């Protein structure tokens, strides 16, 4: 989880919401990582980072981690600094990632993630057989 926070703080240019994800396989071998931000083809220096203008350009950290992973994600574990939204949880299920460890329910106070989307994410995880665990340890960044 500490690596997910490091990735978020180091690479996300979003001034309000910095989310990081790390996917690990057997023996905690890293398979991929990601942060919230625009696709590589969009220069993030040219973006309006205010809400809601930024939303149309954002790729969530979970999707970036999946897209930039190497190796088989089946049975992998995803560590993420905030609860995945329902769309991300569907992608996690599509790649058969079996465990998601998250730190917070909300990314930040202005986040559009709310109780109803949290419940949807939990329902998708349960239906897909994904173990959903709230991280309770210490973070070292």
Language model segments and positions:
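Zinc-dependent deaminase catalytic domain
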Residues: 1-141
């Amino acid at each position: 989880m500490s690596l997910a926070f490091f990735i978020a703080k180091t690479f996300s240019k979003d001034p309000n919401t910095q989310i990081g994800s790390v996917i690990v396989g057997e023996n905690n071998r890293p398979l991929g990582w990601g942060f919230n931000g625009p696709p590589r083809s969009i220069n993030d220096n040219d973006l309006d980072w205010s809400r809601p203008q930024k939303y149309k350009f954002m790729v969530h950290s979970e999707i970036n981690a999946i897209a930039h992973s190497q190796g088989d994600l089946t049975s992998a574990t995803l560590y993420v600094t905030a609860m995945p939204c329902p769309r991300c949880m569907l992608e996690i299920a599509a790649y058969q990632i079996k465990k998601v460890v998250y730190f917070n329910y909300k990314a930040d106070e202005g986040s559009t993630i709310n109780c109803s989307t949290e419940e949807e994410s939990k329902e998708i995880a349960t239906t897909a057989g994904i173990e959903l665990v709230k991280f309770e340890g210490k973070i070292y960044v």
